[in-house]
Amino acid sequence: MPRIDDAALHEAALAHLARFSATEAGLRRVLSNRIRRWARAAGQAGQDPEAIAAEVARATAAAAAVAARMVRAGAVDDAAFAAARARRLRGAGRSGRATLAHLAQKGVAAELAAAALQGEEVPDEFHACLVACRRRRIGPFAAAAPGPDTRRKWLGTLARAGFGGEVARRALDTPRAEAEARLA
C-alpha cells in the first residue's frame, strides 16, 4: 500500500476546497479522515502496526502544514467562512446562540464568530426570530389566534431554538402585516 505523501494531501485539500468552503479546522478534519481511512486499509492489507502508526503521525503533521499553507494562500479564510455562514443561518431563522454554536462546531474561533454576527449584512435577532415563526407557522403566521397554552408552547419552541424571551415575545406579538413587511 503506498504512503500518504504531502502531494496526495495537498491534492485532497484542493479537491475538497473546490467543492466546499471550509475552515482551517474543518480542512484538517477532512485530511485526518483521509489518513484514518488509509490507516484502516493498511491494517487490513497486513502492514506492520508500528509502521502504520509512524506514517499516521507523519501524515497528520503534514496535513496540518497543508491546511496552514491553504490559509496563507487565501484558499481558506475562517473570517469569510464565518460571515457567509452567519448570514445564511440567521437568514434561515437561526438564533444568535445557535449560529455561534454551529460556527464553533465548524472550528471558527469565538471572537471571529462573534464578529461575524455583528456584520451589517447579517440579519438581526428579531428578523431571525420572525423567520423562525414563519417557518413554524406560529405567532403572526399562525392560522388562528392562540390560547394561553398555545402561546406558552410557542415561547418554548422559540426558547429551544435559542431566542431570548424578550425577542420571542416581541416576534409573537408582531402583527402579521408588519412581520411580512419586515421580512420582505
Annotate the PLM regions.
Residues 1-184:
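An alpha-helical, amphipathic repeat domain used for nucleic-acid recognition
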